[in-house]
């Protein structure tokens, strides 16, 4: 019995080894191509920030986003959103009203006005955070995209501060880490491997879930 089980497992391994090797090589080639073709870290901002990690620019959101580039390529990127404030005359945040053609402009809730009383984050120092929604960040520039950031709030979260200060969002797009994209490729690869008609049946027979036709043929003989 042990000899037959060893033969059955060896047969399964012999059949599956070439397919597994081909699948592994294919996935590695896809991963290498993805790394080579992924764009470098991109700064998407309405403000020129000298220190994006300083106290004036805290990180307010981090997530995944698909970035579409003018070449037509699409890449999975990690999106970091910093909220930058101008708190004094000696500020490190320099706002630009005329970005270059290749600079993406972020339209966020700090320009949002309520239709009821006209309160704006920019000109009303007693505005509350609910007056300044920022549920969607529109990225406009070389390419047009829209990121639905449902958890991103406006810089007006500081209810008791002087909200007449100028605010801007500083966005950074960087290549996705070895995680979500890779697991997605492996999942597709496993499903593709399952397209072989005998893949699942061979595994089931090797585990004893399905009867082995060769085994029953020997018994009948």
Curated annotation (Swiss-Prot):
Record keyword DNA-binding present: no
Q: Which GO terms describe its biological process?
A: symbiont-mediated suppression of host natural killer cell activation
Q: Which Pfam families match?
A: UL40
> Which ranges of the sequence are coiled-coil?
none
Q: Which InterPro entries match?
A: Herpes_UL40
Q: Which UniProt keywords apply?
A: Host-virus interaction, Modulation of host NK-cell activity by virus, Viral immunoevasion
Give the superkingdom in one word: Viruses
Is Coiled coil found in the keyword set?
Answer: no
Chain spans, region HLA-E-binding epitope: 15-23
Q: What does this chain do? A: Plays a role in the protection against host NK-cell cytotoxicity by up-regulating the cell surface expression of HLA-E independent of TAP (HLA-E has an inhibitory effect on the cytotoxic activity of the NK cell). Also promotes cell surface expression of UL18, another viral protein involved in NK-cell evasion.
The record's similarity note reads:
Belongs to the HHV-5 UL40 protein family.
Protein name, entry field = Protein UL40
């Amino acid at each position: 019995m042990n000899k037959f089980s060893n033969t059955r497992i060896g047969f399964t391994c012999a059949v599956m080894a070439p397919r597994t090797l081909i699948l592994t090589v294919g996935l590695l080639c896809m991963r290498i191509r993805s790394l080579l073709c992924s764009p470098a870290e991109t700064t998407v901002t309405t403000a020129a920030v000298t220190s994006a990690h300083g106290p004036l620019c805290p990180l307010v959101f981090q997530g995944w986003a698909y970035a579409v580039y003018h070449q037509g390529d699409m890449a999975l990127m990690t999106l970091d959103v910093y909220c930058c404030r101008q708190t004094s005359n000696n500020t490190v945040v320099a706002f630009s009203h005329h970005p270059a053609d290749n600079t993406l402009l972020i339209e966020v809730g700090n320009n949002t006005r309520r239709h009821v009383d006209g309160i704006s984050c920019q000109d009303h120092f007693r505005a509350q955070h609910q007056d300044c929604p920022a549920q969607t960040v529109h990225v406009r520039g070389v390419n047009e995209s829209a990121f639905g950031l449902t958890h991103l709030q406006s810089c007006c979260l500081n209810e008791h501060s002087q909200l007449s200060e100028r605010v801007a969002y500083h966005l950074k797009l960087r290549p996705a880490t070895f995680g979500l994209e890779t697991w997605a490729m492996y999942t597709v690869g496993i499903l593709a491997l399952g397209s072989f008609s005998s893949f699942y049946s061979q595994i089931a027979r090797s585990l004893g879930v399905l009867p082995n036709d060769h085994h029953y043929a020997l018994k009948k003989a």
